[in-house]
Amino acid sequence: METVAVRDIFKNYKEFSNVKLVGWVRSNRDNGSIGFISFTDGSCIHSIQLVYKNGETNNFEEAKSTRTGSAILVEGVVVESKQPNQSFEIKVTNFILLKQADEDYPLQKKEHGAEFLRTIAHLRQRTNKYGTIMRLRSELAFAIHNFFHQNNFVWVSSPIITSNDAEGAGENFYVDSKTVKNFFGKNASLTVSGQMHAEAYAQSYKRVYTFGPTFRAEKSNTNRHVSEFWMVEPEIAFCNLEQLMYLIEEFVKYLIRFILKNCKDEMTFLNKLSNNTLSEKLLNAISHPFEKITYKKAIAILKSDVANKKVKFENESIYFGMDLNSEHEKYLCEKVFNKPLFIYDYPAEIKAFYMKMNADGTTVGACDLLMPGIGEIVGGSERESDYTKLVKKCTKANMKVEDIEWYLALRKYGYHKSAGFGLGFERFLMYVTECENVKDTIPFPRSYGSLDF
């Protein structure tokens, strides 16, 4: 008899009679002559109750002594359950203990806090909550590739090791060999963005995207920062800012619709954890157009509301040219508009060197997308297409022009226009799961002062 997945039994348990299952014990209790195991095989969020009885189950005593976390193989019969919270259970006829878990297995049948679970990141996905989050991570990764494939984008595997800093912020991890000094002949670092390489390929395919890990050496240990995270970075030739914001909105709404349609069990579970507010939030996000305001308008709203004492910020020095703090973004997104919000046309001095200057000579064609409860999840812009202007901006930013000459030179060879954005994958996961810490949305988080596992 072939083994059956728990997922398939839950689809229609009445189609099954005798089954063989292999997986792990979530919990085990007995009252002497009868015992109950909560069983999972990782194929879905659900557990199945296994019932074993003295005289009816082979290896009954072994079943009684099996500890939480152990691997087992069972054969049994699918029967209707008398319990109000389950439709069926498995009456075990044959029980085989494949591997007994040690007594110090840390995930016993009780609630564990997020901070403790981060110390056992190699095991936390066995809990309902983190198992659900990581399954959603997998489903969303598939959805991302699916969206771009449906919209005729070419996936570009941008390099992890690079010699350029796409953001110009200098927050790099440097790479070298222990055995060969100056291995690459120049400074090498882990990528902070795949944007530059995506721009090169967009000039051949028009629509491209990268999706992979990026690295930032930020000396920060907040609930919003990790040193290794994943970015989705599309790049589109002949695209302007208005078209880019349209694409961002369509992309974000597609991802939300995808999980609401294809991950119903996971979303139902997370919705209960949020006191039934998560599904309402997500449905509202996809039911209405995203709001759009200029940076100038955002500053005007903030200044007015501070002056009229409608709001109190820690930083109440509001002026054109400031970098908006998270408290300002949160207020605009959640209190003023109460919906996803684009802010666009930022002052050039607070944005990256590669962004295209607007006709006013002070702002650039850049946008950020803010989501209620999380803040910025997307940053995008039109790219400067003039070679001479871009060289001047690099020089002004104290960048070594020779290190990115290949990138600058793209402007000499038919580079008319391009625009792109970056979506922080973990930030987006925080939004759709209502996780409060980005470290809980990535399997093995890396952050300042922490490199476990």
Curated annotation (Swiss-Prot):
Source organism superkingdom: Bacteria
Gene this protein is translated from: asnS
Broad class of where this protein is predominantly found: cytoplasm
Disulfide bonds: none
One Gene Ontology biological process: asparaginyl-tRNA aminoacylation
Catalytically driven reaction(s): tRNA(Asn) + L-asparagine + ATP = L-asparaginyl-tRNA(Asn) + AMP + diphosphate + H(+)
Protein name: Asparagine--tRNA ligase
Pfam family, one: tRNA_anti-codon
Transmembrane segments: none
Keywords, alphabetical: Aminoacyl-tRNA synthetase, ATP-binding, Cytoplasm, Ligase, Nucleotide-binding, Protein biosynthesis
NCBIfam families, A to Z: asnS, PRK03932.1
InterPro entries named among the record's database cross-references: Aa-tRNA-synt_II (IPR004364), aa-tRNA-synth_II (IPR006195), aa-tRNA-synth_II/BPL/LPL (IPR045864), Asn-tRNA-ligase (IPR004522), Asp/Asn-tRNA-synth_IIb (IPR002312), NA-bd_OB-fold (IPR012340), NA-bd_OB_tRNA (IPR004365)
